[in-house]
């Protein structure tokens, strides 16, 4: 006997096929090309109705995930009377799950079964007598909307969008703030150029403009809420002797409007930064503890989502953000970059130049572990303990490389000291002599240390003198050898000249004799 399991928006339908080997038929499409043929081939054997829309959504999600729900299992157990029966299902995952139940079904799910389902879905209202086409389409539409809402609600990727958009907006705000602040200083600098040198903070500069206006009102304006007392005095003194030009009320109104924008942008930037920090602590607490909110958010934004970043190996996380440098190095066969976005992490910043690459590698390895726990842990703890432990290990490694004292891990719990009540001790006069002896012994130790230092210094001085003397002797010997060589060369030259003169003289005398 062959059965076809059909999932509808109203419930599970188990159809009984008249042909036992219908799924093996070579002319299946021609056999099921009309309503009469489909109704002749399939009859309704059992139907399990969904009680509510929530129940329908739950059962549909089970089918999508390839799981057998209790309702479906009960339906199949009631229909397993024939030991040699075959069950045709649409999903391969669902077929594997039904096989694991140990029911007396030969479960089939392949390309041929899709043709059976195509015919069954087309004539489904005719196969199910209690349902008409209009009701079935309405139920299907409602179930489709419910599934869509469920996917949007529980999608982990959608949560990452908040972080990605927030960090992108934060970077844009920083650029805008810098541009506006520079323009404001240049604009107001014509009227009060000395203010930019005294007040370097852009937001404080804008707030001073809003509070003071023209520089002539500076003496009567209270700037204590914006500036410290010393800086306020300097500003007021500079305003009295300023070399700036005068400006009109229209100019001042426009400058104030720009300053107001700067103050508003700065307040919104702080609010956005707090929001990003809270979202990062909620979504990736361990990564946040390890590298910080901004670096962690940039890593997630660069990768696209928390899941895709968690799937990346540590070597990829290490150079994430330095792709151009990496491919340029591979093309020119030079050394590849040691860090990308991780360069801005505080732990990498604490390391010296030669150790930055090593710390970046260790940090990337620990970040990969923290990310996988944040993204994939079923019963995740949001305290960030794993990130804290990983940070402590990276700090210990940094201390080891830099030659500093090793730091203890943050999870070390020290027992509280027990307070014991004892009797008050009487004054012991003998302890005074002991203290004097101890101080004397301490002074002896100090004298011994000083003697040792003096001996070391004397030995070092002797060695330096000996080295200098040896160098002088070597130099003197070299000079003597050079002089001897020069003299030998000179003597050889003189001998040669004498010989040449003698030869010339002999030749001349021979000619005269002839």
Swiss-Prot record:
Residues 454-477, 488-514 have a biased composition (Basic residues). The keyword Aminoacyl-tRNA synthetase does not apply. InterPro entries: Nop56/Nop58 (IPR045056), NOP58/56_N (IPR012974), Nop_C (IPR042239), Nop_dom (IPR002687), Nop_dom_sf (IPR036070), NOSIC (IPR012976). Residues 430-514 are annotated as: Disordered. GO terms for cellular component: box C/D methylation guide snoRNP complex; nucleolus; small-subunit processome. Keywords: Nucleus, Ribonucleoprotein, Ribosome biogenesis, rRNA processing. Required for pre-18S rRNA processing. May bind microtubules. Belongs to the NOP5/NOP56 family. This is Nucleolar protein 58. The lineage of its organism: Eukaryota, Fungi, Dikarya, Ascomycota, Saccharomycotina. The gene is NOP58.
């Amino acid at each position: 006997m062959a059965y076809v399991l059909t999932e509808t928006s109203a419930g599970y339908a188990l159809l009984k096929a008249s042909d036992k080997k219908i799924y093996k038929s070579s002319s299946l499409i021609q056999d099921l090309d009309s309503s009469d043929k489909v109704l002749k081939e399939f009859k309704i054997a059992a139907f399990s109705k969904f009680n509510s829309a929530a129940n329908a959504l739950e059962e549909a999600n089970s089918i999508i995930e390839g799981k057998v729900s209790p309702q479906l299992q009960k339906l199949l157990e009631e229909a397993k009377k024939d030991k040699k029966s075959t069950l045709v299902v649409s999903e391969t995952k669902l077929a594997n799950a039904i096989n694991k139940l140990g029911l007396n079904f030969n479960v089939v799910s392949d390309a041929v079964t899709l043709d059976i389902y195509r015919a069954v879905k087309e004539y489904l209202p005719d196969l199910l007598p209690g349902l008409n086409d209009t009701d079935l389409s309405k139920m299907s539409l409602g179930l489709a909307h419910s599934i869509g809402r469920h996917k949007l609600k529980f999608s982990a990727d959608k949560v990452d969008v908040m972080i990605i958009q927030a960090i992108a907006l934060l970077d844009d705000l920083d650029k805008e703030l810098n541009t506006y602040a520079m323009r404001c200083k240049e604009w107001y600098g014509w009227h009060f150029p000395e203010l930019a040198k005294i007040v370097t903070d852009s937001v404080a500069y804008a707030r001073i403009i809003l509070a003071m206006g023209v520089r002539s009102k500076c003496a009567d304006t209270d700037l204590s809420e914006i500036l410290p007392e010393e800086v306020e005095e300097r500003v007021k003194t500079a305003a009295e002797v300023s070399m700036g030009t005068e400006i009109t009320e229209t100019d001042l109104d426009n400058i104030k409007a720009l300053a107001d924008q700067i103050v508003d942008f700065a307040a919104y930037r702080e609010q956005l930064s707090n929001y990003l920090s809270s979202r990062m602590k909620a979504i990736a607490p361990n990564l946040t503890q390890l590298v910080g909110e901004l670096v962690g958010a940039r890593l997630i934004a660069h990768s696209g989502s928390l899941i895709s970043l968690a799937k990346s190996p540590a070597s990829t996380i290490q150079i994430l953000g330095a792709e151009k440098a990496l491919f340029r190095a591979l093309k020119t066969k030079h050394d590849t970059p040691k860090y990308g976005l991780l360069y801005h992490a505080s732990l990498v910043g604490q390391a010296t130049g030669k150790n930055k690459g090593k710390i970046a590698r260790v940090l990337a390895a620990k970040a990969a572990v923290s990310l996988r726990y944040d993204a994939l842990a079923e019963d995740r703890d949001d305290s960030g303990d794993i990130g804290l432990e990983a940070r402590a290990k990276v700090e210990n490694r940094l201390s080891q490389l830099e030659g500093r004292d090793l730091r203890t891990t943050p999870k070390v719990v020290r027992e509280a000291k027990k307070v014991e009540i004892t009797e008050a001790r009487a004054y012991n006069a003998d302890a005074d002599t002991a203290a004097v002896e101890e101080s004397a012994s301490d002074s002896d130790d100090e004298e011994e240390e000083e003697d040792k230092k003096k001996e070391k210094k004397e030995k070092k001085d002797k060695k330096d003198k000996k080295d200098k003397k040896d160098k002088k002797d070597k130099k003197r010997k070299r000079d003597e050898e050079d002089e001897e060589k020069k003299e030998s060369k000179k003597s050889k030259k003189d001998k040669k000249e004498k010989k040449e003169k003698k030869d010339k003289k002999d030749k001349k005398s021979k000619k005269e004799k002839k």
